Design a protein with these regions (language model features):
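Bacterial N-terminal signal peptides that target proteins for export
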Residues: 1-9
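Bacterial N-terminal signal peptides
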Residues: 8-17
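Transition segments tied to proteolytic processing and entry into folded domains
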Residues: 20-34
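Structural detector for short beta-strands of small beta-barrel domains
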Residues: 30-61
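OB-fold (S1/OB) nucleic-acid-binding surfaces
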Residues: 53-78
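Short nucleic-acid-contacting surface segments enriched for D/E, G, S/T with interspersed K/R
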Residues: 81-98
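Short, charged beta-turn/beta-strand-edge "cap" motif at the junction between a beta-strand
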Residues: 102-108
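Cys/His-clustered metal-coordination modules, chiefly Zn-binding fingers
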Residues: 112-159
């Protein structure tokens, strides 16, 4: 009987370990993919009109931003700490960009992680900088520390 009990414990432990291992492996699978995409960020309504002749309601003109790739693909961007910059700073919508993004399964929306300007064969990381407080921010606004002005900063990315 004693050996029977030990065999049962060994089987249960193996089953639990296998289940825990499968559960752990499931958690390790990424919830998103990281990608790098190039193009220009534009208003979705403007891109749909220009590319497909689709008109939007007037109140939707500046409602959604998308990354338009050179091949004409439109990728909508999440409006969050990074994505808000495209709504607030028109200069960003005039630049050739490379965006490092997260793509989540089941949604076309992309979350911007980093943004780079492509100019004259070089790549520059973009953010906002307060010269007084020496802090980085990710959208155009007053400095979070001193409430003073901040500037768009371009930092050369070395190959």
């Amino acid at each position: 009987m004693k050996h029977h009990w030990l065999a049962w414990v060994a089987c249960a432990a193996t089953a639990l370990a296998g289940g825990a291992s499968a559960l752990w492996q499931g958690e390790e699978q990424p919830r998103y993919q990281v990608e790098s995409l190039r193009g220009r960020v534009v208003w979705a309504s403007e891109a749909m009109r220009r590319l497909h002749g689709v008109e939007s309601d007037a109140d939707a003109a500046e409602w959604l931003i998308v990354l338009e790739t050179p091949s004409g693909e439109l990728h909508p961007l999440v409006k969050d700490a990074r994505g808000r910059a495209f709504y607030k700073d028109e200069r960003l919508r005039q630049m050739d960009l490379e965006l490092l993004v997260r793509r989540y399964p089941g949604t076309p929306l992309l979350k911007v992680i980093r943004l780079y300007r492509l100019r004259d064969g070089a790549k520059y990381e973009l953010d906002y900088w307060c010269d007084v407080c020496a802090i980085t921010m990710y959208e155009l606004k007053e400095c979070e520390c001193c409430q003073g002005p901040i500037r768009l900063r371009e930092t050369l990315v070395k190959p």
